[in-house]
């Protein structure tokens, strides 16, 4: 596939790795005979490591077929996470090092997860935009003192810590943005 045919979201092979294209910048410099160049911002699958690479319009890249299977988190088997396909209940097992920091957002029975599969092998997951987690430890609200909002740290039931508004108390369920790791509102 030529570089000028590649779109955002395509998965390609490059430098003995597999990468998903997240952003494309097109430039056509006037001084070099008008050769169009493409700069791809891509992330490794699995791993999510960022890579910037530039290509001429007629450079060839090998496209890789990546399937996204909607799944539900089922259980943890040692250091591995097991997800079940929502359609045919195929189990997908991914090691904790592949899941990485996303493990802090995974709770029993979490739905809306997409397992990314290449050649029938699970390689990565894509979490839902937000998840509901429970606050298990946060300091009490300080009365008076200031009219400004002050965030405070809160430890959640999966072990991660986020900053929450002062009015959030222990035992409360909160929405957490999985892309930024920030408080996104009260659940329920």
From Swiss-Prot:
Protein name: Elongation factor P-like protein
InterPro entries attached to this UniProt entry: Elong-fact-P_C, NA-bd_OB-fold, Rib_uL2_dom2, Transl_elong_fac_P/YeiP, Transl_elong_KOW-like, Transl_elong_p-like_YeiP, Transl_elong_P/YeiP_cen, Transl_elong_P/YeiP_CS
Family affiliation: Belongs to the elongation factor P family.
Annotated GO MF terms: translation elongation factor activity
PANTHER family for the chain: ELONGATION FACTOR P, TRANSLATION ELONGATION FACTOR KOW-LIKE DOMAIN-CONTAINING PROTEIN
Superkingdom field: Bacteria
Gene Ontology BP annotations: peptide biosynthetic process
Xref: Pfam families: EFP, EFP_N, Elong-fact-P_C
Organism for this UniProt entry: Stenotrophomonas maltophilia (strain R551-3)
